[in-house]
Structures are given as C-alpha cells and as structure tokens.
C-alpha cells in the first residue's frame, strides 16, 4: 500500500498483521489503527478471538454469537478480519506472503508457538528485512519464566502492584476485585507495545531494517510502581498498603456526599490548600487546630481529620463540592461511576464518544457509542472508519490487495485455501456464546451498583445533537 503524504492520518499506508488474542495486544494495536494503519486481524476457525463471544449486547444471546461480543467490538474497530490456519503448511506459506508486503507483525503467543511454527523473527526477516515483529508476552522471550501463562491478575500479583493495593489491615487486592476495577498492567503493557512499534517504525526510516520487539508485561507492570521500587533501592523500605492515603499529602481520600453512594476525592498538598478546604466546608477553625495546622501534623492525625471532613461533605452534592473546591484551589473531583463518565460534559464537549455503526451481520444491535482515542490530531476527525470485522469478513479482499490477485485467479486461490481448511468463514462448531450474565447474583455480590433499565434512553438523550441517534435501540 502506498503512503499518502497529504493524509491527516499519520500511519496511513502502514500495514500491520495482528495475531492478537483477548485484550492486551488488540488494545496495543487499536491506536495504530485509529491513526490510519491498515490492520489485518488474523484468526482461524480453530483459534477465533475469544472476546467474540461476549459480553453480548443487552445481556441477550444473538446469532451468530461470534460476531456480537462487546469487548471484541471495542478493541477491533478500524481493523479488517481474515482467517488463516497457521498450523497448516499452506497457511504458513500464505502468512509469509503477507509478511513480505507488510510493515509490522504483532503477536501475543507464548514464545514456543512461533518457534514451533517456524515463524521466528529471523524467518520473517528473510522474506522481508524491513518487517517489525512485536512479541507481547507475560514474561518475555527469554528466562526461566518465558513460557509461563500470564493473564493480568497473574502479572498484577508478581510485579508488586497487588501488594500495594488495598487497606493496611486487609489482604492484598487485585485491581479487578476492588482496587483499580481493571487489570492495570494489561493497559500499561498494551501502550508500551504501541510506543515500541512507533519507535521501531521511526528507526526503520533511518536504517531501512526492521526490529524484533520483545515486550514483557511483567516488566511493564514493574515500571508502573517506580516510587515503591526506588524507595527500596534508595532506602531499604518495603512499602505497604495505604488505601487512599498518600506518603506526604494530607488529607487525601474519598469522602461521602449526599445521595446514594456518591463520593468526592480530595487531595491536599499544602497548608494553604487546607485553609481553603476548611473554609469551604464551614470549619475554618480546623486550620488553627494544632492537630491539623501543618502538613506534618495532619499526617499524624488523619483518622480524626477524616471524620471531620466526612461529616461536612455529606451536606454537599459531589458535583457542587467539586466545583466549589476547584474554584478555591483545592484538588478535588467527583468519584465517577461508568454512567457519570458517559454523561460527563467535558467529554461531551471534546467529542470523546462517537456512534459506531453495527457490523453487517448484526444490524439489530444498531449503532453503539464507543470511546475515541484520548488524543486528537489536527485536520483529522478521529472517527471510526470501520466497525470491528465479522469473522473472516475481509479474507478475499485482503488477499486480492496484498497479493495482487483478481478474477479467476483469485477465485481459484480462495477455493483451494477453503478446501484445505486454511481459511474459513465461521469458527469450528462447538464454540458457543457466553451465558447471559447473572445480574441478580452480581448485584447481591456487590459487583454491580445497579442495573439501569433506561440506559439506552439516557445515552440517546445525552448524545442527541452531537452524534447520530441510536437507531434500532
């Protein structure tokens, strides 16, 4: 594909072959697709993308289930989908032909997989010396842990983050079970991968040769806790859990406001900010109390101080207190739930959410709002160009473009690959959609705050006038 120097999308013309499963690698490649790269997501009938099966829209099962998974649609917009079975010789040959005319290959298999397939970086570089290979794994391509299985909760534990998450008198907590709400090392690892690819593309402009990028989620996770690591290397301190508090700011925490489960986060860095906080909350005398007058004193009396603050914040709505404290120069923000985020006026002003049309196989779902990348490029709309692909939707199209085939030659080539089981238009039988989520059970367990029966109307009303209406909802 020829690059268009006048395109507002900086990666237009860059071809990326994504052998990505689940979350981290698809997330790493998503920003590159948004920046214009032609991303071809490769699956096979025996190894379809796991996120295809759920969660299903409106917590209802749809057919074909493998084209309806919400996570799949979030992570794979702006990508084209093909199927190639790499376990078959013809599949590997076909893959190498695509590598020969591509810029980047990204994969997140365990290290032994590509070795066993004979698709190492050295082999890819033989057919294309300019190819860049990103290998995204839990623990890297070398070392005693190289073939360990690693999902986010595993790396979250081993990289030290879990030990730092939670309350001092409670066991360690992982992000997805009461800490961060997401598996943070997954996100960090993903964007390290994005950055590495961009850096390798830039270097290739100078050297003319590709690179092998060996990404370890473990190492990316350790890099997210630099203060704790540095505290040990410099002082011998092994940090523990401090809940919402801070090593030197005080007060800091989440305080209750009026309304069910409404909270405000406050973080005070200076004595001047504390004077302002005490004044806004109607307790100016606290600033003259010897227990709270200085930062050092406040740090030693946080339990008592938190009680005073919590009693006062209950008289405010979170939104009004946020505005008032910010105007007074105090760091404060509403503790937003997912509905608050969708309804946020700042994000609405920025056009952060956009309506994305449904894939061809799922018209009954209708357009859905999705988050755009967290950046804007001048002269580029940032709008989604393609919905996430149906299974094998673009196989024929990509083979024609990348290999220069057409007409009868293309027909014969595709027919032969299909007959050999190299390509397919649906996953192998036996793979089914996830069961609908047990909403009552999740509510009872506290994993959901509530189920909003009017969520579609709320979103429709909020986005009306900014984006296309939510047709077919």
Q: Where in this protein do the model-derived segments appear?
A:
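Aromatic-enriched alpha-helical interface/lid elements that frame and gate functional surfaces
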Residues: 251-332, 339
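Conserved Rossmann-fold dehydrogenase catalytic segment
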Residues: 141, 171-183, 205-221, 241-247, ...
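Glycine-rich beta-alpha junction loops
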Residues: 46, 139-140, 217-222, 259, ...
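A glycine-rich dinucleotide-binding beta-alpha-beta segment and adjacent secondary-structure elements
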Residues: 328-385, 438-440
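Oxidoreductase and adenylate-handling cofactor-binding alpha/beta cores
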Residues: 167-169, 190-210, 223, 227-235, ...
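Short Gly/Pro-enriched turn/cap motifs at secondary-structure boundaries
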Residues: 63-64, 72, 239-247, 254, ...
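Short, well-ordered beta-strand elements within core beta-sheets of diverse protein domains
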Residues: 17-20, 83-84, 262-269, 306-316, ...
């Amino acid at each position: 594909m020829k690059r268009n120097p006048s395109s507002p999308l900086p990666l237009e013309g860059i071809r990326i072959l994504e052998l990505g499963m689940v979350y981290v690698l698809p997330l790493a490649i998503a920003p590159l697709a948004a920046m214009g790269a032609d991303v071809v997501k490769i699956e096979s009938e025996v190894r379809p993308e796991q996120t295809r099966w759920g969660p299903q829209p409106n917590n209802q099962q749809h057919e074909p289930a493998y084209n309806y998974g919400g996570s799949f649609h979030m992570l794979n917009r702006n990508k084209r989908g093909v199927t190639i079975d790499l376990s078959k010789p013809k599949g590997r040959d076909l893959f190498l032909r695509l590598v020969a005319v591509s810029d980047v290959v990204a994969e997140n298999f365990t290290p032994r997989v590509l070795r066993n397939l004979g698709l190492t970086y050295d082999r890819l570089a033989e057919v294309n010396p300019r190819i860049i290979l990103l290998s995204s794994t839990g623990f890297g391509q070398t070392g005693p842990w190289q073939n360990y299985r690693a999902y986010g909760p595993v790396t979250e534990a081993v990289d030290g983050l879990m030990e730092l998450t939670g309350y001092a008198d409670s066991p360690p907590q992982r992000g997805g079970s009461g800490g961060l709400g997401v598996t943070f090392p997954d996100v960090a690892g993903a964007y390290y991968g994005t950055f590495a690819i961009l850096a390798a593309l830039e270097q290739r402009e100078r050297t003319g040769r590709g690179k092998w990028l060996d990404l370890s989620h473990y190492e990316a996770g350790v890099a997210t806790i630099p203060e704790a690591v540095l505290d040990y290397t410099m002082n011998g301190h092994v940090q523990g859990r401090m809940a919402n508090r801070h090593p030197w700011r005080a007060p800091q925490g989440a305080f209750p406001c009026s309304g069910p489960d409404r909270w405000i986060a406050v973080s005070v860095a200076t004595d001047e900010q504390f004077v302002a906080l005490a004044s806004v909350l109607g307790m100016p005398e606290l600033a003259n109390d010897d227990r709270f007058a200085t930062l050092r004193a406040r740090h030693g009396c946080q339990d008592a101080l938190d009680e005073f603050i919590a009693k006062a914040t209950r008289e405010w709505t979170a939104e009004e207190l946020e505005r008032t404290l910010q105007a007074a120069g105090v760091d404060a923000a509403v503790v937003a739930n997912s509905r608050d985020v969708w309804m946020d006026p700042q994000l609405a002003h920025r056009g952060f959410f956009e309506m994305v049309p449904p894939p061809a196989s799922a018209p009954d779902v209708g357009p859905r709002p999705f988050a755009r990348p967290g950046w804007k490029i001048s002269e580029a709309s940032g709008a989604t160009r393609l919905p996430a692909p149906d299974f094998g939707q673009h196989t024929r199209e990509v083979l024609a473009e990348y290999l220069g085939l057409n007409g009868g030659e293309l027909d014969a080539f595709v027919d032969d690959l299909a007959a050999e089981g190299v390509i397919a238009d649906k996953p192998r039988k036996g793979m089914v959609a996830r069961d609908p989520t047990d909403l009552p059970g999740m509510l009872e367990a506290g994993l959901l705050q509530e189920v909003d029966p009017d969520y579609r109307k709320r979103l429709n009303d909020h986005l009306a006038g900014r984006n296309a209406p939510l047709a077919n909802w």
